[in-house]
A protein has these predicted regions:
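Catalytic pocket-lining loop regions of alpha/beta-barrel enzymes
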Residues: 3-128, 136-138
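Active-site glycine-centered loops adjacent to acidic/histidine catalytic or metal-binding residues
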Residues: 131
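Active-site gating loops and adjacent loop-to-helix segments of metal-dependent hydrolytic enzymes
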Residues: 1-11, 152-160
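Mid-to-C-terminal alpha-helical segments outside catalytic/metal-binding sites
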Residues: 123-125, 141-195
Length: 195
């Protein structure tokens, strides 16, 4: 059938093909021990559809027994409108989240609330992340990297301080959680240091 045929322009056929290909690639990634990164939350560009980035749309994939060996990372932890969905999805055994992009889009104070919510649910599944790209001609990725790293660390400190102040964790546990978010969780997920 020619590529330009009307059959390939049918949304239902394209959707079925996309679903098949995604699940095939996800299964192979699991077999190879490679986490699958899925963009969730806000995005840029006229091609972007906000409702398509709701992580709750992944629930059938995340519940698929054939994909249990595949780890999924919800990039941006649902940034903005969908962060609460990401929190709930972390209860799945093979789902992780990073809070990248939120470091750039929202204030450090608001980010600290998001980080605290994530830590109170499943701290062993939360990872630091940035979202480095040249946003404007005036600001390059180096500046964005510095800024997002600073805001991430400050938000993490505010979240952990609040948890200590509220009696949820000790200072020792706060230090442990900080190390987990900034290093250990990613090292475990990606197998850093294993040979």
């Amino acid at each position: 059938m020619p590529v330009g045929s009307s059959v390939l322009r049918c949304p239902c056929i394209c959707s079925a093909l996309q679903n098949y290909l995604f699940r095939y690639v996800a299964r192979e990634a699991g077999r190879l021990g490679l986490p699958v990164h899925i963009h969730t939350g806000g995005g840029c560009g006229s091609y972007f559809m906000l409702m398509g980035s709701n992580p709750a749309l992944l629930e059938t994939v995340l519940n698929d027994a054939a994909l249990r060996k595949t780890n999924f990372v919800l990039i941006h932890a649902g940034a903005g409108a969908f962060t609460k969905y990401a929190n709930y999805l972390l209860m799945k055994p093979n789902v992780y989240a990073d809070f990248s992009e939120q470091t750039w889009l929202i204030s450090t104070r608001r980010l600290s609330d998001t980080v605290r919510d994530l830590l109170e649910w499943y701290p062993e599944k939360v990872m630091f992340g940035t979202d480095l790209y040249a946003n404007t001609p005036e600001i390059n990725w180096e500046e964005i990297g510095w800024q997002t790293t600073q805001s991430s660390r400050e938000a993490l400190a505010i979240a952990l301080s609040g948890m200590m102040q509220d009696g949820e964790i000790t200072r020792e546990r706060a230090l442990e959680l900080a190390h987990m978010v900034l290093h250990d969780n990613a090292a475990k997920l990606y197998g850093w240091g294993k040979r």
